[in-house]
C-alpha cells in the first residue's frame, strides 16, 4: 500500500454545479459562484469543468491571468472564437487556446438538434504563450496514453483502456502534482477507486510513478501533470 503519496479525491456527485439557460457545467474546482475550501486550484490547474451545451447555444468567458485553455470534446464537436481565430474542434482532438490576462473566448454548439459535452481545462502560466495549438489522438488505439497538451510547465494525456489492463505513468518532475480525471468507466489509480467523472489529485508521489488499472472495458482516463 502506498502510504507516502498524498491524495485528494474529487467525487463526481460532490462537484459544483451551475446551469444558465442552455449551458450546464459541473466544476471539479471553484468556479463562478461555486466555492468550497477544499476545491481550490491544484497548482497551475485552475479549472476543470464538465460542460454541456444545447443545440445552437453559446457562451463566453474571460481569463484574469495568462492562461492555456484546453477544449476537449467528448460528445460532438464545438466552435470556438477568439480575437485571433474562429474554428471547429471535434471528438478526437484538443484545442489549446493561449490567452493573456483580460482576453475572452467564445464556445458555440453548431448543431441544430444535438447536445454536446466537452471538458474545459484552464492552466495558468507565468507568461502567455499566445500560440494556439491543435492536438489529435486516436482512442481506437487502446491501452496507450496520448499527449494532448505540452508546455514548459504542464503536460496532459488521454487514453482508452481494456478492462483489467494495468499501466503506469512516470512523472516528469517529482516536485509536480498529477490530477487524474475519469472520463468514462472505472479505474483504480494509486490504490484509489475512481468512477466516471471522479477526479484525484496526487502530490509527493511515491517512486515518481502513477500506477493505474482499468476495471471496465473501454474506460477513458485523463491525466495532467502540473506545477504546484
Enumerate the predicted regions with their spans.
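Hydrophobic transmembrane alpha-helices and immediately adjacent juxtamembrane helices
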Residues: 1-10
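Conserved short histidine dyad/triad with adjacent acidic residue
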Residues: 9-37, 44-65, 74-102, 154-174, ...
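Short beta-strand segments
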Residues: 48-49, 73, 122, 183
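Structural motif
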Residues: 77, 184-186, 218
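Ligand-binding loop in jelly-roll beta-barrel domains
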Residues: 84-86, 99-129, 152, 204-228
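Conserved, well-structured core segments that form or line functional sites
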Residues: 113-189, 196
Amino acid at each position: 500500500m502506498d502510504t507516502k503519496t498524498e491524495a485528494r479525491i474529487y467525487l463526481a456527485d460532490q462537484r459544483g454545479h451551475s446551469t444558465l439557460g442552455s449551458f450546464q457545467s459541473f466544476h471539479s474546482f471553484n468556479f463562478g459562484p461555486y466555492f468550497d475550501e477544499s476545491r481550490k486550484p491544484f497548482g497551475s490547474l485552475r479549472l476543470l469543468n464538465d460542460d454541456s451545451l444545447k443545440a445552437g447555444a453559446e457562451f463566453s468567458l474571460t481569463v484574469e491571468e495568462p492562461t492555456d485553455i484546453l477544449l476537449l470534446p467528448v460528445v460532438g464537436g464545438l466552435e470556438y472564437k477568439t480575437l485571433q481565430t474562429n474554428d471547429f474542434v471535434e471528438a478526437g482532438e484538443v484545442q489549446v487556446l493561449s490567452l493573456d490576462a483580460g482576453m475572452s473566448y467564445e464556445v458555440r454548439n453548431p448543431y441544430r438538434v444535438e447536445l454536446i459535452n466537452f471538458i474545459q481545462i484552464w492552466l495558468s502560466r507565468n507568461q502567455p504563450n499566445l500560440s494556439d495549438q491543435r492536438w489529435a489522438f486516436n482512442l481506437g488505439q487502446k491501452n496507450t496514453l496520448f499527449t494532448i497538451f505540452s508546455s514548459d510547465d504542464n503536460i496532459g494525456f488521454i487514453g482508452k483502456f481494456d478492462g483489467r489492463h494495468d499501466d503506469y505513468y512516470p512523472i516528469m518532475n517529482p516536485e509536480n502534482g498529477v490530477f487524474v480525471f475519469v472520463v468514462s468507466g472505472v479505474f483504480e489509480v494509486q490504490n484509489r477507486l475512481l468512477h466516471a467523472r471522479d477526479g484525484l489529485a496526487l502530490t509527493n508521489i511515491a517512486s515518481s510513478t502513477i500506477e493505474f488499472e482499468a476495471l471496465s472495458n473501454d474506460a477513458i482516463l485523463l491525466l495532467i501533470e502540473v506545477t504546484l
